[in-house]
Curated annotation (Swiss-Prot):
The lineage of its organism: Bacteria, Pseudomonadati, Pseudomonadota, Gammaproteobacteria, Enterobacterales. Belongs to the IraP family. This is Anti-adapter protein IraP. Interacts with RssB. It is found in: Cytoplasm. Residues 1-36 form a coiled coil. Pfam families: Anti-adapt_IraP (PF10796). Keywords: Coiled coil, Cytoplasm, Stress response. The gene is iraP. It comes from Escherichia fergusonii (strain ATCC 35469 / DSM 13698 / CCUG 18766 / IAM 14443 / JCM 21226 / LMG 7866 / NBRC 102419 / NCTC 12128 / CDC 0568-73). Its main location: cytoplasm.
Length: 86
């Protein structure tokens, strides 16, 4: 029983580490996108945003992905593009 608990704790720690890495990757990408958008002129920025939103609108979600997840992704992309972090 102790071995099982130990194994579960190790797996949990590994998952937590993977989760931290994913959060760091997302935050890094958010910083990069924000910096790139801020360094563009308004017309270029609008063009890039329109292209990204158009590409996202044209993507048909996989049936295995819950609708809530798809909407969350779309909302986050919109927030990132239209209201980048400060």
């Amino acid at each position: 029983m102790k071995n099982l608990i130990s194994e579960l704790l190790i797996k949990l720690a590994q998952k937590e580490e993977e989760s931290k890495e994913l959060v760091a990757q997302v935050e890094a990408l958010e910083i990069i996108v924000t910096a790139m958008l801020r360094n563009m002129g308004q017309p270029e920025q609008k063009r890039v945003i329109d292209q990204i939103e158009g590409a996202l609108a044209g993507v048909k979600p996989d049936a295995s992905v819950p609708d809530g997840d798809t909407e969350m992704l779309r909302a986050y992309v919109k927030k990132l593009l239209r209201h980048p972090r400060q």
